[in-house]
């Protein structure tokens, strides 16, 4: 019997319930189909060593994450929840992942590890609030580079940094280089460095929280605030469609910003004010407040509970405490719910029926557009198993004509799932002829049609000639027979008569006009004229 090869991708699909639970802990939502697509088709194209079957290597995951988080049009905001979940699986592997995770390298001798202090806390697993606990550092304190907290912050990406202090010794420099190399192999710097102001240490190897957030602990143990940069806001606004034009894409962008940047309440207001219009923002806030749930888990309209969970005025939350961070987590979750609900247009099935497959559009891309139309113009979730029949029928009827006709003729169509229909449509799509083949086929069809038309014309001409020949033959035969009969009949009607012989009764002594045997009609007979002979 053959053996089935287990890969990281197949392993996650076998334990999909655990994957969704881990994603939920990260405050994100993942879908199985897109999980497979990104792992097997998208991430291998980044050329960072990601295999089609997936991997739990932290270095490769970090490189893919840097490409996904790339700001501007080169980023992939829709893939953020998936790579964050992959990273969570690799950093804190469940029992079924541990056999596939390579052991972490032991620390170098030159970097001794100190035992954790009594106040050390494990890093937070949540992806929607900042980790405010400073990490224990074994390296000696570095000379201060930035001015004190009262002075202005300097953007090291756009301005020249201030001069450093005394140069360290060669041995210290070598130790620092080795430590930096070891750290960069595990987790490269975040691509969104424009979010930070000043110099920061690279993240630790076992940290799962992004370091690009407004609130983080400075080197002196004081909480520092790092606001959004104007370039980030400008790029996000100009490189993405408006919320009214494409709410799904802008919602995915804001979701990725909430995960990677860990914004505060003020940052959220700045983000909404930049990316949304006034009317759109009010609609989002209203939908978010409708999503607030009471203690019984059902939506509530009590003003005190709604204002406590999603305040419209600046709250006095202390982000250094667990309670304050929990408030911020809930606020971001409600904000995402408001964006998703506000992005839904009024129910309009005509819009859904108007989504048809393009001439060169793949069935998978068409299905994604169709599902997006269901989410936007109907209250139904296309991922709901109860709606699979409706989505399948729309997929068949609104596919390209050649694909739709073949899908309708499938045997046992009622038992086919949506995935089966997509696979059949992909087969039909891939077997389509190329433009050159289509032109050649059309040319051959035209030539064959012309050849058939010429053959039919020749056949009709031959039939016409045969018919004309038959008619002429009949006519000639009739003429010949008539002439023959005329010749034969003339000899009988005109016998040789004597000069005084009657042509009617053949008697001599009178002519036919005076023949007494010839009937005269109602008129009386004419007086007979006697003929005088030479003897008289």
Curated annotation (Swiss-Prot):
A zinc finger (CCHC-type) spans 500-517. The modification Phosphoserine is found at residue 190. Residues 449-464, 484-500, 508-517 have a biased composition (Basic and acidic residues). The keyword Cell wall biogenesis/degradation does not apply. Residues 108-121 have a biased composition (Pro residues). A lipid is attached at residue 2 (N-myristoyl glycine). RNA-binding phosphoprotein p12 is phosphorylated on serine residues. A motif (PPXY motif) lies at residues 161-164. GO terms for cellular component: host cell late endosome membrane; host cell plasma membrane; host multivesicular body; membrane; viral nucleocapsid. Residues 108-218, 449-469, 481-500, 508-536 are annotated as: Disordered. A motif (LYPX(n)L motif) lies at residues 128-132. Keywords: Capsid protein, Coiled coil, Host cell membrane, Host endosome, Host membrane, Host-virus interaction, Lipoprotein, Membrane, Metal-binding, Myristate, Phosphoprotein, RNA-binding, Viral budding, Viral budding via the host ESCRT complexes, Viral nucleoprotein, Viral release from host cell, Virion, Zinc, Zinc-finger. It comes from the Viruses. A motif (PTAP/PSAP motif) lies at residues 109-112. The record marks 129-130, 213-214, 476-477 as: Cleavage. Gene3D superfamilies: Gamma-retroviral matrix domain (1.10.150.180), Human Immunodeficiency Virus Type 1 Capsid Protein (1.10.375.10), Zinc finger, CCHC-type (4.10.60.10). This is Gag polyprotein. It comes from Xenotropic MuLV-related virus (isolate VP62) (XMRV).
């Amino acid at each position: 019997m053959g053996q089935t090869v287990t890969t990281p991708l197949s392993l996650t699909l076998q334990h999909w319930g655990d994957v969704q639970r881990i994603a939920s802990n990260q405050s994100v939502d993942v879908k199985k189909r897109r999980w497979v697509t990104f792992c097997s088709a998208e991430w291998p194209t980044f050329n960072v060593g990601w295999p089609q079957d997936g991997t739990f290597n932290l270095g490769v995951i970090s490189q893919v994450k840097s490409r996904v988080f790339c700001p501007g049009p080169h980023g992939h905001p829709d893939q953020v929840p998936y790579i964050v979940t992959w990273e969570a699986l690799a950093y804190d592997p469940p029992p079924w992942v541990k056999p596939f995770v390579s052991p972490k390298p032991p620390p170098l001798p030159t970097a001794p590890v100190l035992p954790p202090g009594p106040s050390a806390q494990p890093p937070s697993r949540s992806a929607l609030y900042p980790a405010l606990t400073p990490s224990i550092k074994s390296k000696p304190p570095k000379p201060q580079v930035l001015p004190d907290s009262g002075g202005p912050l300097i953007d090291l990406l756009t301005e020249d940094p201030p001069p450093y202090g005394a140069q360290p010794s060669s041995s210290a420099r070598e130790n620092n280089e080795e430590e930096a190399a070891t750290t960069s192999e595990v987790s490269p710097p975040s691509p969104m460095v424009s979010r930070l102001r000043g110099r920061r240490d690279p993240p630790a190897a076992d940290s799962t929280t992004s370091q690009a957030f407004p609130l983080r602990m400075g080197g002196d143990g004081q909480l520092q605030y790092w606001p959004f940069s104007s370039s980030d806001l400008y790029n996000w606004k100009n490189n993405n469609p408006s919320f009214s034009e494409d709410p799904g894409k802008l919602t995915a962008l804001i979701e990725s910003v909430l995960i990677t940047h860990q914004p505060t309440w003020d940052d959220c207001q700045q983000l909404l004010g930049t990316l949304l219009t006034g009317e759109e923002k009010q609609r989002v806030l209203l939908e978010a407040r409708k999503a607030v749930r009471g203690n019984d888990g059902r939506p509530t309209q009590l003003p005190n509970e709604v204002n406590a969970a999603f305040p419209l005025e600046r709250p006095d939350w202390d982000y250094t405490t667990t309670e304050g961070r929990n408030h911020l987590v809930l606020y971001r979750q409600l904000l995402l719910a408001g964006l998703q609900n506000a992005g839904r247009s009024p129910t309009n099935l005509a819009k859904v029926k108007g989504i048809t497959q393009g001439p060169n559009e793949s069935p998978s891309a068409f299905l994604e557009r169709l599902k997006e139309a269901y989410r936007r113009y109907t209250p139904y979730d296309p991922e709901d198993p109860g709606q699979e029949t409706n989505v399948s029928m729309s997929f068949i009827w609104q596919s390209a004509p050649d694909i739709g006709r073949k899908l309708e003729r499938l045997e046992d169509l009622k038992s086919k799932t949506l995935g089966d229909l997509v696979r059949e449509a992909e087969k039909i799509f891939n077997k389509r002829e190329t433009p050159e083949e289509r032109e050649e086929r059309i040319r051959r069809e035209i030539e064959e049609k012309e050849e058939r038309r010429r053959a039919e014309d020749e056949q009709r001409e031959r039939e016409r000639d045969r018919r004309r020949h038959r008619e002429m033959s009949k006519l000639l035969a009739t003429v010949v027979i008539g002439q023959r009969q005329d010749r034969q009949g003339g000899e009988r009607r005109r016998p040789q008569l004597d000069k005084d012989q009657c042509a009617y009764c053949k008697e001599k002594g009178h002519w036919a006009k005076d023949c007494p045997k010839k009937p005269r009609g109602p008129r009386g007979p004419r007086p007979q004229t006697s003929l005088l002979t030479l003897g008289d």
